[in-house]
Amino acid sequence: MNTVIDRLQPLTIDDLNKVDAATLDILGNTGMCFESKEARKIFKTNGFKVEGKNVFFTETQIRTAHESVSKKWTLMARDPDRTIEMNMDRYSIGMGGGSPFMVNADRTYHAATRKDYINSLKIAQSLDAIETWRVLVIPNDLPAENANMYMMFNQIMHFNKVYALTDETSIDFLKITYGLTEKEMQVQASEGIVYGQITINPITPLVLDKTMCDRAILMAKAGIAMNIAPMPVAGTTAPVTLPSALILQNCEILATLVLTQLITPGCPVAYGTMASNADMRTMGCVYGSPESRILEYAGAQLARFYNMLSRGDVGLTDSMTSDF
């Protein structure tokens, strides 16, 4: 018995088939809520059952969309030497993301600023192991309506590896940077050539809100690679048992995946593993727990089961202090 491999694969083949069967049952009988009229129109035009905001999926519809997802793609970088091949036989290391605070050397902390954001870009640029960007810190000293444009502009100024988009305005920056039209980017994505990536976050349980719906549609039209990463929390937004939370995550990923493939067949999609559990004393979300890692391993197994690339997070902790 390979102890290391077994620990990284908590599910048996029988378990994987059970998760898949439960997913098909939920998406077929409960469906998923899509809060965008445009998204529901796309589903209805393609023969999906739509009732109110809920869309229902047959096994054939899910399998057809899944089969069209690209199994490998090239993530283009502004520096051609930084371009990377994404496939089932390699892994890529990128930045963490979404931190609102910066910790100082004296262990105090402050709200992240524009300077912190640019410094984090420079650090990522200098590290050869880092291949892709993700917004490490969000500058709080900018109006919210300007933050995404500022972040994308400075990403292009200070980073020549693979870009991470922050919102819809990022597409315009990519078109200018690479001298391409949106249609050209879409066609190239179908051929496995991609100019950026973004994360799409469904809301547990079983909702893709209007912002994320519209974002997924626009990104698919532009051929942007998407990490579909819901964040079910066992015990609060998801059932308390780990298998149930895993099934819910699987439903949300596959249903969102279908939408992307209806728009651009072959559009690159990665299986995001972000499920976690709740601290039942405080009801807060716990991301550094053993349960979170088990769910992450199981999610990666499901991705391989569906022959999809996956994305996960490492180095997470719920410690109240740092040890530097």
Enumerate the predicted regions with their spans.
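Helix-rich catalytic cores of soluble enzyme domains
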Residues: 112-324
